[in-house]
A protein has these predicted regions:
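NAD(P)-dependent aldehyde/semialdehyde dehydrogenase
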Residues: 3-106
Length: 106
């Protein structure tokens, strides 16, 4: 994201995710995001979240298992990281989960 609009974009995107990314039963019409396919993938996404935190990225939203689904499924809260550098694992590798990294350039 271009440095001059970075902060404004991050705030707008965060609000958009809050109102759009409805987590829940994938068979309901209002659901935007269902569960991870397997426990292995669920654990993999959570490990990327831990990697982002430990490498110094800023967790803006999500970053945890999503619990409000009646105890069924492998749900992850929509996750947003900012201040991501190009040498970080979460920047270099595809997560395949509800996960966005935002970095800036001049």
């Amino acid at each position: 994201m271009q440095e001059g609009i970075y902060d404004k974009f991050v705030e707008a995107f965060k609000e958009h995710v809050k109102t759009t990314s409805v987590v829940g039963d994938p068979f309901k019409d209002d659901t935007f995001q269902g569960p991870q396919v397997t426990k292995t993938q669920f654990d993999r996404v959570l490990s990327y979240i831990e990697s982002g935190k430990s490498e110094g990225a800023t967790l803006v939203a999500g970053g945890e298992a999503y619990k409000n689904v009646g105890g069924k499924g492998f749900f992850v809260s929509p996750t947003i990281f900012t201040n991501v550098k190009d040498n970080m694992k979460i920047y270099r590798e595809e997560v395949f989960g509800p996960f966005v990294v935002i970095s800036s350039f001049k």
